[in-house]
Each structure stands twice: as structure tokens, then as C-alpha cells.
Amino acid sequence: MRMEVVLVVFLMFIGTINCERLIFNGRPLLHRVTKEETVMLYHELEVAASADEVWSVEGSPELGLHLPDLLPAGIFAKFEITGDGGEGSILDMTFPPGQFPHHYREKFVFFDHKNRYKLVEQIDGDFFDLGVTYYMDTIRVVATGPDSCVIKSTTEYHVKPEFAKIVKPLIDTVPLAIMSEAIAKVVLENKHKSSE
């Protein structure tokens, strides 16, 4: 009898018995499923250039190496890149005081040059301190005509439910818009120079 009581108390402690009805209901402590909220954000920018012209900048390993020169002055307090700018390269970015996020690191995970898309994963930084467990940007260049395309950018992130209300106002499409506009500017300037 004593052993059964110890066993029931132990099972109640690790959560394998519903205490109210004493019904076995699995092993939640051992097989815990944490629910996370998945959020998708979208940005699109139409560009008066061919998809191949835009992808030649967006998909280039040179892009990561020259990022501070392409973006508005003062956007980074510190910028370092590990790698050659291609798959596996890591961008370590620190922003000026007073900005949030103040710091994060991104990794170029995948480039598909045939279909003109890439995956860029945020691997650590301030958002992860606020309950974000996954953060991935997908950038696609989609042809809409022989001399026009759309840069379609998506941010997908997962956040613990208790942090969702805090994080939602902090993550937006502004970084995607800034990057797309910088890419379009370079492409259109190059196109203009070549037509002179």
C-alpha cells in the first residue's frame, strides 16, 4: 500500500496523472509541447528592372561585404562579417544607442540562384532575449515583365505566447523595406549608367 501511494504521488508530481480525476493522460513533463505563436510579415517593392538585374545584386556574395556602404549612413554602430558573403556567412550588427534591437547576428542560410531567392536567419540578439525562438527572412525576386520585377520579402518569427504582446510592436517590415530600396537604388543607378 505504501509503495502505491508513493507511486501515485510521484506520478502526480511529474504530471502523468490528472490530479482531479486520477486518470492517466500521458507524460506532459517528459513530452512537453510548448505552444509558440507564429507571425508572418510581408513587404513588396516593385522595381523597373529585370529580375535577373535585381538578383545580380540581391543574390551576390558582394552584397553582405558592402552592406554598410549601401544603407543610410550611421545605420550601424558596428558591422562585422564572417565568411565570404555567401551561404554560411554571418553578419554581426550593432546599432546606435537608443535603437531597438541594439544588436543581432544573421546567417545567410541558403541561396537559390535559379529561382532567385535566399534565406537569412537571425541566430541571436535582442529579440531572442524577448522570447523569440526563431526568426527567418525570405527574399524573392519575381519577374513581372521583361524589364520589371518585385522584391518580395517575408519575415517569419516564432515567439513564446507570454512575450507576443511585447514583441509584436517591435518587429516590422522596416528593415526589409530599407534593404529592398537600397538594392533597387543600386540596380537602377547601374542601369542608368549603362544606358549613357
From Swiss-Prot:
Key words of the record: Alkaloid metabolism, Hydrolase, Signal
A single GO CC term for this protein reads:
cytoplasm
**Which positions are annotated as binding (4-hydroxyphenyl)acetaldehyde?**
D137
Q: Which InterPro entries match?
A: Bet_v_I/MLP (IPR000916), Plant_def-hormone_signal (IPR050279), START-like_dom_sf (IPR023393)
> Coiled-coil annotation: which residues?
none
MF annotations from Gene Ontology: (S)-norcoclaurine synthase activity; abscisic acid binding; protein phosphatase inhibitor activity; signaling receptor activity
Residue pairs linked by disulfide bridges in the UniProt entry: none
Q: Which domain of life is it from?
A: Eukaryota
EC top class, as a word? hydrolase
User: Hey, which family's this protein in?
Assistant: Belongs to the BetVI family.
Q: Spell out the protein name for this chain.
A: S-norcoclaurine synthase 2
Q: Which gene encodes it?
A: PR10A
